[in-house]
Amino acid sequence: MQENVLEPIETLVVTFFEHPVLAARVKDGSIYMAISDLCEAAELNYRAQLRRLRADQDLKDGVQQVRLPTPGGLQAQYCLLLEYVPTWISSVDRARASDLVKERLRYLRRHIIREVYVSITQAAGLPTGQSRNIEDLRDLE
């Protein structure tokens, strides 16, 4: 995880679970999402999630401070690289979330599982679709 603060070249408020989330594009073209906004949208504790992200061996690489506009002016905020959001979202504990957010997180997690499965089957040259479409287990070799 890098600790230098990036300057955005473009920002845009996007909607996530019917809540505004600030997205920022930085100089190298990467897009970061404000972690505090993501947590608010998913009814998650920001401090706990930031601790989790920073402690995770893989996800910490996607955490970066970006100087973002706030009501008090530009301030450095922790953001998560867009590519890391699906893995983070699929790893959160949904126990304390409202029923609506639990269902949304479940939907996203199942979508992530399907997309990763498709990527694996394509990389391995296996039939697409469900695993029952693989007629010969030797195709897995």
Located regions from the model:
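Major-groove DNA-recognition helix of helix-turn-helix-type DNA-binding domains
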Residues: H19, Y46-L74
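Positively charged, aromatic-accented nucleic-acid-binding surfaces
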Residues: M1-L44, P69-E141
